[in-house]
């Protein structure tokens, strides 16, 4: 979600200047620096949680987030991952087994890096919370979704006239639906109950291509994914250190991985996690890379069929862009899972490493850092820009990709204002490169062969609010 740049925040607050103003040319004193020389984004634990931890904006290339002065956004197509959540039941089982080993020594005084355990309690109240979106703490999932909707109202509110009913779309999974509802409340405000129409799209395989969550059950490129070990040498070092500080725990490298998974979820429910400091920065770097491998080989470009899965959304959004707001509409807000966004990026051909990621070491500098791609609440926004002529570009329609509120250049197509891509070029590139989903994934001819719900939607408000109690471990897909 949009955040004011730390670089200029103090100046903007003090003077009312633009967030991109650089302030006075002459410092107030000879010792005062106009710009800080300290940048610590790479040390942020939020960038090494993989897809488990709270939302954070993508590290940008410095391209202005606002549209260029010669342009106006006239259409927005967004897909957002659900907000921050508790671990899944399967992850919870592994976490509880690792914690059982930690507590097996029956000590009254933990030592060293685990000294905080003398006062710590597990943040999951009981097993019914597994899978659920979090509602407590400053990083809570539902709070994230509401704030995001509110931020996008400020950014894109001009695309709604305040009167028409706007459809928005969620896959049929409990926490995804709740994210969509909270986002809708944030965006539409008092008008949510009357002017927003939530459409829930089943996650069933029989939906074929008419889905936010298309599947590829004939996938024949899962060997690497199926054999990932989720281990790097640093986890053995961590296990040895913790075992030496508190003898008798007998933690293994696998236990360390599961404890780090637990730690990476804790901030989703609490404002602070002592578990972060139980592991070193280097160990967190290794953990983040292990998560990168998981997404890359299981739901990203490391699986050759994922581009075809993502082509469903990429191709349908291309149709919207070419139809434009007058024919198709201006606002398309969609909600799904992390592993539905990564195939879309693969289909678009962005953030693709030059070679497959190595399994035995961290590939520093590779573009596939999942903490920058799909953290909790992560989102990909496609902007259609209507631009006036400038000294560098012609009047016309352009396309911009924005990933987690950072402009993501569309590979080599950056000749437009604000490094955008001319719509005609964007169209040509995708038409040439997008694989065919139904052929690649051998989709049954009895299933829908293309995405149609953006054009065939309901305008009723009956699904805007839940009508039943929250079930234990809610998260099962709805048919």
Curated annotation (Swiss-Prot):
Homodimer. The keyword Endoplasmic reticulum does not apply. It holds the Pfam family His_Phos_2. The active site is at residues 82, 338. GO terms for cellular component: fungal-type cell wall. Disulfide bonds join 71-387, 128-472, 216-441, 225-298, 413-421. Glycans are attached at residues 191, 315, 458. It catalyses: 1D-myo-inositol hexakisphosphate + H2O = 1D-myo-inositol 1,2,4,5,6-pentakisphosphate + phosphate. Its EC number is 3.1.3.8. GO terms for molecular function: 3-phytase activity; acid phosphatase activity. It is an enzyme of class 3 (hydrolase). Catalyzes the hydrolysis of inorganic orthophosphate from phytate. This is 3-phytase B. Belongs to the histidine acid phosphatase family. InterPro entries: Acid_Pase_AS, His_Pase_clade-2, His_PPase_superfam, Histidine_acid_Pase_euk. The gene is phyB. Residues 1-19 form the signal peptide. Keywords: Disulfide bond, Glycoprotein, Hydrolase, Signal.
